[in-house]
Amino acid sequence: MRGFSNEIILKRTLTLSDFTLRYHKRGITALQVIKAPSVSNVPVLLSGDNYGYFVMWDLVTKRPITHMEIEGNSHIIAFWWVETTNVLYILSKDSMLRIFELDSSTQRSIDLVRKLSQANKTDHLQWTKIYEMPINTLNFANFIIEAEVKPTKDNKSYRLVCCHTDDSETIDIYQIIEDSTFKLKRPFNNINFPRFLKQQNFLGISKDSKFGIIMRFAKLNDVIFLGYENGFVVGFKITFDEGLQRDIAELVHVSNDHYPNPILDMCVSGDELYSCSTDDFITKYKIPVNLQLETKYLRDDALLIKCPSSLRVSEPSKVHLPLKNIGHIDKVKDDYLVVSSWSGMTIVYNMRTSEVEQTFVKSKNNLVVSDSSMGDLTNGSGSNTESSSKSHNYKVGAMTCLESFDVQSDGLRLGQLRRIKALAKCNWCLIGYEDGTIKLNKI
């Protein structure tokens, strides 16, 4: 997109929101759409704010289902919901990962068209904290939960991938065993990919160079991606090493297209990884679903890391956008890329036509007195739409999307079915702002 006027494009595509969710009194910092069959037969929304409040939303009635206050009122960074066990992981700025279970004795399906007088009665849903552990959150990084490859019939086992407790340039991998007692093991401690790449002289990286802290995690199939402060992205998977007779980390992806700018967000769609930074572009990497088996490796047994000797820097394609400082990114269906910038603007970009189709902002509606001798009152707009609007738009604290979905009509009354279909037939962009509101926007 060269030679266009950013201001004209963004103003021309400005779109009003369809719905607003109001409950939070502080800035939204985390959003996630999940499936929770024990609660609702349609997807629900999780939201968290910078004062430790967590809300589960009914997206059909646009009302809270249940809410909870994290002890210490600590800024919520990220969620992860494990549907099979009704367990919710919440990472907070006080460097604690808290694990909650939805009380099975109180679960029931929600009547999606209940009366107004019943709408806020959420006592039937209870969250029980079953564990908490320290995690380094200096960088506001998220975390990854993935199911173990070989679960047993007696319990369910998961891997937790997160920043190392003390060194936020490295990671830890825990094994979480959910049984009657809830067990935690740490088979990988302080995995240091920057040190490994320097030792192997990969890309001629100087041993004195700094990767900085890990900014974001993402997962695509069995590959975990780390986005660093210096713009590098590395991807690895856990494989069994015959020589060591144990699992080790195998590097399968390295890229540095955002260097030296920090990775601000990553998302996955199909077999593609998307990343963003302070640049005015998104990088897109196509990741093979079935990685080829290698016979020759570079390795460091002390670090428990290896990589194929044929590994090279991945070559991405770039999607140029009329925004910089892109803090949030998501993908909808095959065509639409949704991005939010530090300016408070969110755009829907059609990758097939290379056009911005929608722009969402929440304005503070501040009048600014001009210094001009003409003495006019303006809304602060200028030639640079993004920079001029930065102080006049509410900042985006979190953004996520919900794709259209099929509806099972069995057992639903006509009114229920109509309201669910109104949600299910559309793609949605959900944006949480610093004033505590959450906007629902049809795409």
From Swiss-Prot:
Disulphides: none
Coiled-coil residues: none
Transmembrane portions of the chain: none
The keyword Ligase belongs to this UniProt entry's keyword annotation: no
Keywords attached to this entry: Chromatin regulator, Nucleus, Repeat, WD repeat
One GO CC term, this protein: nucleus
Region Disordered, residue ranges: 372-391
Single Gene Ontology BP annotation: chromatin organization
Record localization: Nucleus
Subunit structure, as described in the record: Component of the ASTRA chromatin remodeling machinery complex composed of at least RVB1, RVB2, TRA1, TEL2, TTI1 and TTI2.
Protein name in the entry: ASTRA-associated protein 1
Protein's organism: Saccharomyces cerevisiae (strain JAY291)
Gene that this polypeptide is encoded by: ASA1
